[in-house]
Regions:
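FAD-binding core/adjacent interface of flavoenzyme oxidoreductases
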Residues: 1-75, 132, 145-166
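Rossmann-like dinucleotide-binding cores of NAD(P)H-dependent redox enzymes
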Residues: 63-64, 69-73, 79-140, 148
Length: 166
């Protein structure tokens, strides 16, 4: 089955008809099956300093790092955060995951979350549960200083993996 891909704005005219607009051009397309992929961006929490601080990345930006951070802080203990925690720990980074819930993978069954945590701890990943990130800032060496419940910790880089939104 062939697939036609359009990079355009679209709106439904009816159940099987969409209107697509790309720049000045527009057309209507009829199909039995229409798949819409709206994309998604990282959900950025309103943490003071998150947007302004250097060496703070979303899941796309951290993949572009040219050097491995020795110390990586990860805000978010869901699927994305844990995937990167495992990857960077196995590459040699000292990884600390901060999760606001009382356990990682809060949407999964308890046993799954517990086993994942145990396996990752065996790989050297540290976890801070019930975290409350108050602020991020850079020191004079551009290290990221993360404040959790007022306690400050220093990282070479911080990943915020707090979900995706359309």
């Amino acid at each position: 089955a062939g697939v036609d891909l359009y990079d355009a704005k679209a709106s439904f005219v009816s159940n099987k008809v969409i209107k697509i607009v790309a720049g000045e051009d527009s057309e209507q397309i009829t199909a039995d099956t229409i798949v819409i992929n709206t994309g998604a961006i990282s959900n950025r929490l309103p943490i003071p300093g998150l947007k302004e601080s250097k060496n703070v990345f979303d899941s796309t930006g951290i993949q572009k790092l040219e050097t491995l951070p020795q110390r990586l802080g990860i805000i978010g203990g869901g699927n994305i955060g844990l995937e990167f925690a495992s990857l960077y720990a196995n590459l040699g980074s000292k990884v600390t995951v901060f999760e606001t819930a009382n356990r990682i993978l809060p949407r999964e069954e308890d046993i799954v979350a517990q086993l994942a945590k145990e396996y990752m701890e065996e790989d050297g990943v540290s976890f801070v549960l019930n975290a409350q990130i108050n602020a991020l800032e850079n020191d004079e060496d551009d290290n990221v200083i993360l404040s959790n419940h007022g306690q400050k910790m220093s990282f070479d880089a911080v990943l915020y993996a707090t979900g995706r939104k359309p």
